[in-house]
From Swiss-Prot:
Name of protein: Cytochrome b559 subunit alpha
Function recorded in the entry: This b-type cytochrome is tightly associated with the reaction center of photosystem II (PSII). PSII is a light-driven water:plastoquinone oxidoreductase that uses light energy to abstract electrons from H(2)O, generating O(2) and a proton gradient subsequently used for ATP formation. It consists of a core antenna complex that captures photons, and an electron transfer chain that converts photonic excitation into a charge separation.
Topology with respect to the bilayer: Single-pass membrane protein
Organism of origin: Prochlorococcus marinus subsp. pastoris (strain CCMP1986 / NIES-2087 / MED4)
Recorded superkingdom: Bacteria
Length: 84
């Protein structure tokens, strides 16, 4: 087989995306990846996997807004009081 100069020997992109084999494979895999990603986030597994707090756990139930630290050098004790 003689290849053109500069050719890598790979199939042209247009030939790949117009093949039936490409669409049979991707008609299953692309929706499956989308559904898996949606379930990963929707079930909360993403929060557990990456260790981030869930949206409902940023504030305590009794609080209606974010806590404000008023003393720069006393911040740790202020936050400790908040969590008790």
């Amino acid at each position: 087989m003689i290849m053109a100069a500069g050719s890598t020997g790979e199939r042209p992109f247009f030939e790949i995306i117009t093949s039936i084999r490409y669409w049979i494979i991707h008609a299953v895999t692309l929706p499956a990846i989308f559904i898996a990603g949606f379930l990963f986030v929707y079930t909360g597994l993403a929060y557990d996997a990456f260790g981030t707090p869930r949206p409902d756990s940023y504030f305590q139930a009794s609080e209606s807004k974010a806590p404000v630290v008023t003393q720069r050098y006393d911040a740790k004790s202020q936050l400790d009081l908040r969590t008790k």
